[in-house]
Amino acid sequence: MASSLLEEEVHYGSSPLAMLTAACSKFGGSSPLRDSTTLGKAGTKKPYSVGSDLSASKTMGDAYPAPFTSTNGLLSPAGSPPAPTSGYANDYPPFSHSFPGPTGTQDPGLLVPKGHSSSDCLPSVYTSLDMTHPYGSWYKAGIHAGISPGPGNTPTPWWDMHPGGNWLGGGQGQGDGLQGTLPTGPAQPPLNPQLPTYPSDFAPLNPAPYPAPHLLQPGPQHVLPQDVYKPKAVGNSGQLEGSGGAKPPRGASTGGSGGYGGSGAGRSSCDCPNCQELERLGAAAAGLRKKPIHSCHIPGCGKVYGKASHLKAHLRWHTGERPFVCNWLFCGKRFTRSDELERHVRTHTREKKFTCLLCSKRFTRSDHLSKHQRTHGEPGPGPPPSGPKELGEGRSTGEEEASQTPRPSASPATPEKAPGGSPEQSNLLEI
């Protein structure tokens, strides 16, 4: 009986403890199972017998199993040494639940066998690992060590792209796993590898070094209209005609100074009523363009100028525009005309460029020099030809010529002045 039980134990299981028990029983020595069951009884020794161990395990089955008890030829481990039963009543066993001994023939399949193969015991022992786990496929491969997994009722995780063992190796198929960053063979990988475990909506993690052919086709949404980058025309048709030859007198009348508002798109060279009328008449008014007259369109003003630049400066006086700013430190004054700004800058620099030939006095303005020369009783020589002429309030630096339109003298109280003294003072414009 004992030999059959031991043979059955060796047959069912291959654990080291079962093999050690069988070896000890063959040599007739003391069994470690027997020694562990008799830890509480110091000083007592009994000869080893298999029947005594089996009977002891059956009697102690009510309280708790021995460290290694045998039931129906199977070994089941237990945790602690036996406690004396005299200190406890039968109603209150040492543990919260008692396990009754086997009363009849039980199905061996109901008990956990000790000697089954590792491939059968792992799913039952590691019951928590059988559930869907994020990293189940990784550590299961290490535990089973080559054992094929169970039936494929558990869904494969989405990152489990390497069902093989060495997932870092480059010898796997092109459709399985990630593409290698460096090709191992001479053949290049395909442009769009389709992963078998992925739905069609997902793209590969490593994009191809060059786009797919359908991306190389020109699409209308990426093409910008070329007229966006076309340079805009500088002038309108009227300006092109005036500069090209259809209206040459118009370009000749403005000269180098340019007309008022001529730089704006859709405008003629001047916005005065006379120029607008000549623009409307076109070629019929070619004779009138020889002596252009630019009049102020402000109601109640009616001033007329021979140059569009003079009219432009005059209109700044009406609008209050002061585009010329003094850049001197802590000054920042603004002026309507450039000659006014130039005179103002001389007050900062203390420059006196006009010199009297009789007494060698120097003045910052030409009109101051002319006034000083009258004290000598002789007509002044005028400003030197090298420097720009200084005018009154109504003239600019580049507008030294007298107006072609006759104007009454601005200072009628001094008619006895010699004509060579200061010819520009007779044509001063009051602005």
Curated annotation (Swiss-Prot):
Annotated region (Disordered), positions in chain: 30-56, 71-115, 154-260, 367-431
InterPro entries per the UniProt record, alphabetical: Znf_C2H2_sf, Znf_C2H2_type
Effect of residue 230 to R: Enhances osteogenic differentiation in C2C12 cells
Sequence ranges of Polar residues compositional bias: 403-412
The keyword Transferase appears for this protein: no
Primary residence: nucleus
UniProt function note: Transcriptional activator essential for osteoblast differentiation. Binds to SP1 and EKLF consensus sequences and to other G/C-rich sequences.
Pfam families xrefs: zf-C2H2
The organism of origin for this protein: Homo sapiens
Protein name, UniProt field: Transcription factor Sp7
Family: Belongs to the Sp1 C2H2-type zinc-finger protein family.
Short sequence motif named 9aaTAD, residue ranges: 156-164
GO terms under cellular component: chromatin; cytoplasm; nucleus
Disease linked to the protein: Osteogenesis imperfecta 12: A form of osteogenesis imperfecta, a disorder of bone formation characterized by low bone mass, bone fragility and susceptibility to fractures after minimal trauma. Disease severity ranges from very mild forms without fractures to intrauterine fractures and perinatal lethality. Extraskeletal manifestations, which affect a variable number of patients, are dentinogenesis imperfecta, hearing loss, and blue sclerae.
Tissue expression: Restricted to bone-derived cell.
Cellular compartment(s): Nucleus
The keyword Transmembrane helix is annotated on this UniProt entry: no
Subunit structure: Interacts with RIOX1; the interaction is direct and inhibits transcription activator activity.
Gene3D superfamilies: Classic Zinc Finger
Range of residues in the leader sequence: none
